[in-house]
Amino acid sequence: MEFSQFKVNALMEITARPDLVFVRGQGSWLEDHAGKRYLDFVQGWAVNTLGHCAPEMKRALAEQADKLMNPSPAFYNLPSIELAQRLTSASCFDRVFFANSGAEANEGAIKLARKWGRVNRNGAYKIITMNHGFHGRTLATMSASGKPGWDTMFAPQVEGFPKAEINDLDSVRALIDAQTVAVMLEPVQGEAGVIPATREFMQGLRKLADEHGILFIVDEVQTGMGRTGSLFAYQQFDVIPDIMTLAKGIGGGIPLAALLAREEVCVFAHGDQGGTYNGNPLCAAVGVAVFDTITAPGFMEAAQARTRQLSEGLLALSAKRGLRGERGMGLLRALVLDRDDAPAIVEAARMLAPEGLLLNAPRGNLLRFMPALNVTEADMARMLEQLDGVIAAVRK
């Protein structure tokens, strides 16, 4: 079937898409309508923790679909209880609210912090966030984000999100006032170019929050569920946040997100928060399968080995091609180029024949890598070899 035969104009235009339609995937590979295969190092923007069509997920979906799909969030269901127990047992948090997307989880975190401020801080409502941060595409989460141009895109913004600079504690301190209720950040700023927070900054934020009696919120939508080398990124900084959000990797490809909080922060009253599909057993059962897979003995050790392979490979490529190095945490990494040709490299990689390569360029001079956590050593080596060839070809 030719691409022109697909009625793509029935879809609303929200982004520039190439002229291909993906029809199947397995592991680290996708196949389009013409039968061409692509090595996928985007994985739905760090969503597909176990790659495409993971057998553990397919099994969980089939088994749960045969039992119960959605009885309504007004009732308990077993998979949501099991997943909540797993998440709280593996973290510093006490309670979980399930949602469908990272934006929804972050919106919930904002609402919870503001409710806590009303109860405990005389109505304090401001949440300090970071320039260049990304928290979602609802009006409130866009306002909380620090992406250039977003302050006017759907103006007026939701008020109450002063912006500090990541890894600059003084910039945060200068913004704290009587109306401040929390500080919120990504442990690694993904859209900004894979910029990790430093240990000193994260610990400084915890100390500042304690000194001023405000909340410390970590947005782990992209960094959570093993992506950065530990189950949750905050665990590598030796800090205890008050609130954490998860999405992307927790569902491994299905719509699932979570808002986690410590007991003393859980101030929602009945009716304050909810959602038609939230915590439905079908998605929660997949979440349990993903959690059990990545916490099984040996899984994270294998992912850490692939992290070393990717980091060392990117460093070698950087030295060979005169680039500016690599950075990141775990299997969320970036190759920093010496010029703004990242979009051209992404395009050329996708056009490779007979098999393409899918990459992401959040900045003109930067490539981002978000493979499945169970990517094989052979596929990692293949990607590095393909990337070297593409860079050479683009720069001839």
Swiss-Prot record:
An example Gene Ontology CC term for this record: cytoplasm
Subcellular location: Cytoplasm
NCBIfam families: PRK01278.1 (NF002325), PRK03715.1 (NF002985)
Gene Ontology molecular-function annotations: identical protein binding; N2-acetyl-L-ornithine:2-oxoglutarate 5-aminotransferase activity; pyridoxal phosphate binding
Swiss-Prot/TrEMBL catalytic activity: N(2)-acetyl-L-ornithine + 2-oxoglutarate = N-acetyl-L-glutamate 5-semialdehyde + L-glutamate
PANTHER family hit by this protein: ACETYLORNITHINE AMINOTRANSFERASE, MITOCHONDRIAL, AMINOTRANSFERASE CLASS III
Protein name as annotated: Acetylornithine aminotransferase 2
Record keyword S-adenosyl-L-methionine present: no
Protein origin, superkingdom: Bacteria
Provenance organism: Bordetella bronchiseptica (strain ATCC BAA-588 / NCTC 13252 / RB50) (Alcaligenes bronchisepticus)
Residue numbers of N6-(pyridoxal phosphate)lysine PTMs: K248
Taxonomic lineage of the native organism: Bacteria, Pseudomonadati, Pseudomonadota, Betaproteobacteria, Burkholderiales
